[in-house]
A protein has these predicted regions:
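C-terminal outer-membrane/trafficking sorting elements
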Residues: 257-338
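Extracytoplasmic/periplasmic beta-strand context in beta-sandwich domains
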Residues: 3-6, 37, 62, 273, ...
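Low-complexity, Pro/Thr/Ser/Gly/Ala-rich linker/spacer regions in secreted
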Residues: 1, 246-261
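Acidic/polar N-terminal loop/beta-strand segments that form early-domain functional surfaces
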Residues: 8, 39-42, 291
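Local sequence-structure signature of Cys/Sec-based thiol-disulfide redox active-site neighborhoods
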Residues: 1-32
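Short, conserved sequence motifs used for protein processing/export or organelle targeting and
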Residues: 32-251
Length: 338
């Protein structure tokens, strides 16, 4: 069981240093069992879709929800965690990923293994967070109601000024993107799921140059038919890429981070002859040619647009073409096999 805590915060909010402190406490005390997400409001780190979603669940700042339950002050995170972590979830989530540093495209797989039968509208959400986020200017300085110690101790914030200058603070667990939306895609799974079933959904993000993937985490949230987070998952991007990208179905409606405007993606690329080819074309063929123009593989595009190619191609450079149902070439990519 991984408990997910979503904290509403903002640099303008003087009491939000309490939230920062308790998010740190939770990460230090329950690492691997707690997935913390700092959802910013009214500052340079805001993700509008996420901010609006969390805003509908709270009455003020700082505040938050644990596993999408009742509103709770950040000081109540430990108690809510200890209550929820004892629950046996209906499924566990495994994070996988592939990151292409050249194109800055991140593909994420969330593999859900069910250990009991479920039914109804279950959903799966993918969140990206980043640690050590910082910037320059007054909007990056943190208001601090605990300055001077008059409001008691708060993890060292009582020893810092208000505002805390931008060059003296950085921000952790910062929500960077949420997909496909705050609520998730309706009916992400079949209406009835059997005990032992496994389902994998795939998500695609374009990573801006000022994000540090070495400091980023992938958090999965399985939302049950009551709108509560049944279980979560957490891993660094590096851990997820070490696991690799699991085969699955691409989710649609990525919020803020639209799927790349490309008819085809190949990953990994370069590779050892084993790869996944993803295309937005729902009918047609994918053909692979060597540099001499010889056809070495032809595959019919399946309904989900996902092709696993395991032909163990020889080392070299290949050209991959996507053909639509009228046999027209609609996309071409260079493939390198090492």
């Amino acid at each position: 069981k991984v408990v997910v805590g979503e904290e509403a915060t903002g640099t303008w909010c003087p009491w939000c240093t309490r939230g920062t402190h308790f998010m740190h406490v939770m990460e230090e005390s329950y690492k691997g069992y707690w997935a913390g997400i700092a959802v910013h409001n009214g500052d340079p780190m805001v993700v509008s879709e996420y901010d609006q979603g969390i805003g509908a669940l709270i009455g003020g700042y700082p505040s938050g929800v644990v596993d999408r339950g009742a509103e709770v002050d950040p000081s109540g995170f430990p108690g809510a965690f200890l209550e929820n972590v004892q629950m046996t979830p209906a499924a566990i989530i495994t994070n996988g990923a592939f990151y292409d540093a050249t194109t800055a495209e991140l593909a994420v797989s969330l593999k859900v293994d069910f250990s009991k039968a479920v039914s109804g509208d279950w959903r799966l959400i993918c969140v990206l967070t980043e640690d050590s986020v910082h910037g320059t200017g007054a909007d990056w300085s943190q208001a601090n109601a605990y300055a001077g110690g008059g409001s008691g101790p708060m993890g060292g914030f009582e020893n810092l000024p208000s505002p805390i200058p931008f060059d003296q603070i950085s921000y952790d667990h910062v929500a960077r993107a949420i997909s496909p939306s705050f609520e998730g895609k309706a009916n992400s799974f079949p209406t009835s799921v059997a005990d032992g079933d496994s389902h994998t959904l795939l998500y695609s993000f374009s990573v801006p140059a000022d994000w540090n993937t070495d400091k980023m985490h992938i958090i999965g949230m399985l939302i049950n038919d009551q709108g509560v987070t049944e279980n979560g998952s957490t891993s660094s991007i590096n851990e997820a890429t070490a696991h690799g990208l699991d085969n699955g179905s691409w989710i649609t409606g990525v919020t803020l981070m639209d799927m790349p405007d490309k008819e085809m993606m190949i990953y990994p690329n370069p590779n050892d002859g084993n790869m996944v080819i993803k295309t937005n074309i729902d009918a047609g063929l994918v053909k692979v040619f060597d540099v001499e123009g010889r056809l070495v593989n032809t595959t019919t595009i399946p309904a989900n647009g996902m092709i696993e190619l395991n032909d163990n191609l020889e080392t070299g450079i290949y050209i991959v073409n996507v053909y639509n149902k009228m046999n027209e070439v609609v996309a071409t990519e260079k493939l390198m096999v090492k």
